Amino acid sequence: MTPGKTSLVSLLLLLSLEAIVKAGITIPRNPGCPNSEDKNFPRTVMVNLNIHNRNTNTNPKRSSDYYNRSTSPWNLHRNEDPERYPSVIWEAKCRHLGCINADGNVDYHMNSVPIQQEILVLRREPPHCPNSFRLEKILVSVGCTCVTPIVHHVA
């Protein structure tokens, strides 16, 4: 994810959190939660909106079925955590250890490896507190790619 997209995602997470709080969605409360009615409870959050690459050129005609057409195809798996926002993140898992050759067969002379990206999420802290979150980075597999294997030669 580019720095501009990361900032945008962070802003969207904060706006979503505000919408959840304003909507009054009931979430089971942990007795150790900070009291949002307390005068010392923070009412504002500073956010750096330094967005890079505002003009992202996306071609809507390009097919997005890369996960099937890749020489290193992958499946998407649901990663769910109710203490995180967003609570559901779809992660890529490589289908094969090797890569698909031109004949459509798995070639074990190459390796299929996940492509990982750090993203920002909101984590409830302490757990089960509806109005208390901390920003957290997590590593997510977003696709797979084909690489040459690392070979160690013994002398």
Curated annotation (Swiss-Prot):
One of its GO terms (cellular component) is external side of plasma membrane. Glycans are attached at residue 68. It is found in: Secreted. Changing residue 78 to V: Decreases the affinity for IL17RA by 5-fold. Residues 1-23 form the signal peptide. GO terms for molecular function: cytokine activity; protein heterodimerization activity; protein homodimerization activity. Belongs to the IL-17 family. This is Interleukin-17A.
